[in-house]
Regions:
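Short loop/turn motifs that connect adjacent beta-strands in outer-membrane beta-barrel proteins
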Residues: 1, 40-50, 85-95, 123-132, ...
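Outer-membrane beta-barrel translocator domains and adjoining extracellular loop/strand segments
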Residues: 15-22, 61-67, 108-113, 144-152
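Extracellular loop and loop/strand-boundary signature of outer-membrane beta-barrel proteins
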Residues: 19-26, 65-68, 102-106, 156-161
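Residues on the lipid-exposed face of transmembrane beta-strands in outer-membrane beta-barrel proteins
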Residues: 36-40, 78-82, 117-123, 173-177
Length: 182
């Protein structure tokens, strides 16, 4: 078991500013993000790792659908990575299943929930011990407040309701090719 705690300055004006990349002093701090994470990790033939976390952000953000600010936003998440099969004929060929869930404050987040699941096969080919083959699914659920604001804006403008779905979804198939061992 592990307990991980950290604190990070929130500095939206400096994000992406390469001239501030190596400066440790914050310039435009708006608050602090504090993540707290409990980790269970077990090695063995079928290793696994489970992460349960919560975060708190003290910075102010614009409340969805209002000119007011909200502070003290938080969220939580669960990450699961579980080996479900290991080849007895080829050491290192292991199939992992993973799942992800997160929820954020509906006061200011455009997406209120995220789900993800998939499988990763390590060493898919005998001659490629560090390559991976993966299939994953992800779904980001739009915050109902965001939908309401967009629909109200369309109504007030006399326009048709926007064609809004309830979520964004993706399916991804990937092959990870490691050209050289690290």
């Amino acid at each position: 078991w592990q307990l991980r705690v950290a604190a990070f300055n929130v500095d939206p004006e400096s994000n992406g500013n390469s001239s501030r990349a190596w400066k440790l002093s914050p310039k435009h701090t708006t608050g602090t993000v504090v993540p707290i994470e409990l980790v269970y990790k077990q090695a063995g033939t079928l290793p696994r790792e489970y992460n349960l976390g919560y975060y708190y952000d003290s910075s102010d953000a614009k409340r969805i659908g209002s000119n007011e600010k909200v502070s003290g936003r938080g969220g939580h998440y669960l990450l699961i990575d579980q080996a479900v099969w290991a080849s007895s004929a080829s050491a290192g060929r292991v199939l992992h299943a993973f799942g992800q869930y997160s929820a954020a404050s509906e006061a200011a987040s455009p997406f209120s929930k995220w789900y993800g699941a998939g499988m990763v096969l390590y060493k898919p080919l005998e001659g490629r011990p560090r390559d991976t083959l993966a299939l994953g699914y992800g779904r980001a659920v739009q915050n109902p407040r965001s939908r309401d604001v967009q629909e109200l804006a369309a109504f007030n403008a006399g326009a048709d309701y926007p064609n809004l779905s309830n979520a964004e979804q993706l399916i991804e198939l990937s092959y990870g090719y490691q050209a050289t061992p690290w």
